[in-house]
């Protein structure tokens, strides 16, 4: 088991009925226990599975689902029908269930015992029958769920369950997520705006405004000794020129000020219980010497690495989404980051998009140890020498995602990408990645634009489109995927069909 999710558990509920007698009930319970123990011992699942018994009646189903709703440790429910389990007995429980649902279509035994199977065996082991009945009632009731089909001991089956578990963890985390905005969105920018009320209804997280002046109160109270200790941590953790440690230089003072800004941000985030934040480079408080003298880019980079959601220019949707990406990514090795489409490189089949930001790119995606540097930044209200971590990203496949508000719904846009090696950028000392959107630059970028995608996105080497499909299913939002098989013609058709579906779906639900 992975320690990252020790605070959570997923409940396993088996469906059966009393028609087949007491011996069958005992066998179902024994098989279910063995399966749950086997899943937990496989080492493939990031969240502990807890067997909650066999449901043989409507009252039992309703009781266990209500209990799941009220248990903070429970982040999802797996159901499996060992025998035939008449689906009417699941109606009231499914009406109550608020936690994510996975329907596992499997069987205790892997193969049919051809020479010995009798009617008793067939009655006991009829998931092929029971799971279809359960699937029907879920579909009739418009219950959103993930269906996993496969033998429970197979790695592919366990992987699909593990993906869903990670998404459930991200979803559970977002249900008490607070994002605070220091300042507002960047003026006149459309895509970073949206309906915060609908976002909280759909995705759980809450967004509050926080004036930069409140952050400055925390900034004033930071002790110099704490700042000096953090500066020493910087020098220990990151490559840097030895001259940067010269306390008589402006560069050292900028690093010192960046450390003070980080401590202030940490203090206010902790005090408010926030899991993410946004900044606006045009709103950083007063400008005298006791206040921020630079964009808190270094602080944002380090806080992202520790799991705080971040969105630039007031982009609260990206801040919340990055936090969810980071949670789902826990225990996986390659890293994730907030990124922005910046500059295009037309190079035939290798045409690519440079991903960067002014400063705020997470070091979890760095190909090698980040380098601490200080350079002039001429953007925003603080045009000054500014500390930052400089690096390039790893080479490899990944997936980037964004959420946009289309007025009548949220759309999750997902694009498979391939990070490639970047050429040196001696005049651009920032963190960056260079990627080719799938299936190629022309189609990938074109589809993203047609879908209304943002210039900000949340990227991971470890998460795949399957994670995002599960997330969209749980949230009840639209998902559009751009991958190796995408064509512009078919993509346009999908967008048009989805437009009609979501307009009609509001009337059906």
Swiss-Prot record:
Residues the record lists as binding Mn(2+): 313, 340, 357, 456
EC code(s) of this entry: 5.3.1.4
Reactions accelerated catalytically: beta-L-arabinopyranose = L-ribulose
GO cellular component: cytosol
Family in the record: Belongs to the arabinose isomerase family.
GO biological process, one term: L-arabinose catabolic process to xylulose 5-phosphate
Pathway: Carbohydrate degradation; L-arabinose degradation via L-ribulose; D-xylulose 5-phosphate from L-arabinose (bacterial route): step 1/3
Alphabetical UniProt keywords: Arabinose catabolism, Carbohydrate metabolism, Isomerase, Manganese, Metal-binding
Pfam families registered for this protein in UniProt: AraA_central, AraA_N, Arabinose_Iso_C
Organism field: Phocaeicola vulgatus (strain ATCC 8482 / DSM 1447 / JCM 5826 / CCUG 4940 / NBRC 14291 / NCTC 11154)
Cofactor(s) the protein needs: Mn(2+)
Cofactor remark from the record: Binds 1 Mn(2+) ion per subunit.
Function: Catalyzes the conversion of L-arabinose to L-ribulose.
Molecular function via GO: L-arabinose isomerase activity; manganese ion binding
InterPro entries named among the record's database cross-references: Ara_Isoase_C, AraA_central, AraA_N, AraA_N_sf, Fuc/Ara_isomerase_C, Fucose_isomerase_N/cen_sf, Lara_isomerase
Alphabetical list of HAMAP family matching this protein: Arabinose_Isome (MF_00519)
Protein name, UniProt field: L-arabinose isomerase
Catalytic class of the enzyme: isomerase
PANTHER family: L-ARABINOSE ISOMERASE
Superkingdom assignment: Bacteria
């Amino acid at each position: 088991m992975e320690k990252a999710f020790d605070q959570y558990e997923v409940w396993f509920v088996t469906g059966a009925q009393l028609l087949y007698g007491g011996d069958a009930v005992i066998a179902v319970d024994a098989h279910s226990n063995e399966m749950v123990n086997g899943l937990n011992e496989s080492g493939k699942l990031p969240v502990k599975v807890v067997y909650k018994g066999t449901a043989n009646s409507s009252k039992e189903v309703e009781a266990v689902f209500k209990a799941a709703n009220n248990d903070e440790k429970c982040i999802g429910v797996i159901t499996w029908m060992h025998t035939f389990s008449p689906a009417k007995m699941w109606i009231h429980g499914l009406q109550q269930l608020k936690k994510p649902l996975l329907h596992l279509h499997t069987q205790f035994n892997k193969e049919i015992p051809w020479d010995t199977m009798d009617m008793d065996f067939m009655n006991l082991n009829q998931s092929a029958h029971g799971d279809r009945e359960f699937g029907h009632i879920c579909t009739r009731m418009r219950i959103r769920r993930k269906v996993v089909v496969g033998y429970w001991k197979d790695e592919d089956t366990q992987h699909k369950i593990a993906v869903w578990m990670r998404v459930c963890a991200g979803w559970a985390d977002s249900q008490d997520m607070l994002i605070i905005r220091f300042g507002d969105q960047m003026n006149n920018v459309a895509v970073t705006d949206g309906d915060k009320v609908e976002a909280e209804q759909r995705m759980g997280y809450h967004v509050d405004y926080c004036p930069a002046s409140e952050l400055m109160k925390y900034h004033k109270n930071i002790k110099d000794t704490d700042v000096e200790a953090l500066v020493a941590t910087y020098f220990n953790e990151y490559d840097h020129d030895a001259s940067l440690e010269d306390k008589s230089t402006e560069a050292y003072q900028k690093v010192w000020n960046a450390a003070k800004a980080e401590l202030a941000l940490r203090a206010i985030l902790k005090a408010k219980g926030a899991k993410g934040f946004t900044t606006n480079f045009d709103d950083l408080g007063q400008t005298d010497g006791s206040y921020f003298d630079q964009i808190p880019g270094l602080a944002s980079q380090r806080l992202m690495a520790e799991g705080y959601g971040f969105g630039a220019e007031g982009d609260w949707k990206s801040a919340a989404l990055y936090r969810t990406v980071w949670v789902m990514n826990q225990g996986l090795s390659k890293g994730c980051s907030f990124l922005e489409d910046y500059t295009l490189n037309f190079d035939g089949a290798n045409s690519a998009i440079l991903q960067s930001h002014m400063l705020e790119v997470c070091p979890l995606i760095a190909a090698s140890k980040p380098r601490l540097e200080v350079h002039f930044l001429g953007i925003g209200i603080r045009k000054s020498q500014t500390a930052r971590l400089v690096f390039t990203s790893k080479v490899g496949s990944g997936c980037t995602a964004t959420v946009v508000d289309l007025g009548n719904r949220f759309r999750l846009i997902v694009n498979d990408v391939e990070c490639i090696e970047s050429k040196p950028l001696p005049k651009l000392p920032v963190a960056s990645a260079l990627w080719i959107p799938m299936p190629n630059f022309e189609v990938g970028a074109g589809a993203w634009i047609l879908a209304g995608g943002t210039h900000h996105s949340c990227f991971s080497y470890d998460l795949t489109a399957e994670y995002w499909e599960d997330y969209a299913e749980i949230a009840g939002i639209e998902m559009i995927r751009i991958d190796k098989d995408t064509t512009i013609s078919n993509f346009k058709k999908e967008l048009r069909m989805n437009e009609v579906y979501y307009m009609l779906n509001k009337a059906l639900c």
